Curated annotation (Swiss-Prot):
GO biological process, one term: translation
Keyword Magnesium carried by entry: no
Name of the protein in its database record: Small ribosomal subunit protein bS20
Gene assigned in the entry: rpsT
PANTHER family xref list: 30S RIBOSOMAL PROTEIN S20 (PTHR33398), SMALL RIBOSOMAL SUBUNIT PROTEIN BS20C (PTHR33398:SF1)
Top-level taxonomy: Bacteria, Pseudomonadati, Pseudomonadota, Gammaproteobacteria, Lysobacterales
Length: 89
């Protein structure tokens, strides 16, 4: 346990930030999974709607540094490619 006041504060901040990051990462994963679930069910309209929700979440969290910007771009690109392929089929 920290004895210095600033170290105690930093420990508290770490706990709060960790909890926030875990919640946000969970929200991100859920949004991406909804798109994948719609794609697996061959629901193009549902996949597009879920992608419209997931895309700004990916952008927002990559801007905040929760995930790397390239990972966000990769997710968006691959999901969009799958949606296009489903619509073409």
């Amino acid at each position: 346990m920290a004895n210095i006041k600033s170290a105690k504060k930093r420990a508290k901040q770490t706990v709060v930030r960790n909890a926030r990051n875990v919640a946000q990462r969970s929200m991100l994963r859920t949004a991406v999974k909804k798109v994948i679930k719609a794609l697996d069910a061959n629901d193009a309209a549902g996949a597009e709607a879920a992608f419209a929700v997931a895309q700004p979440i990916l952008d927002r969290f990559s801007a905040r540094g929760l995930i790397h910007k390239n990972k966000a771009a990769r997710h968006k690109s691959r999901l969009n490619d799958r949606i296009k392929a489903l619509k073409a089929a």
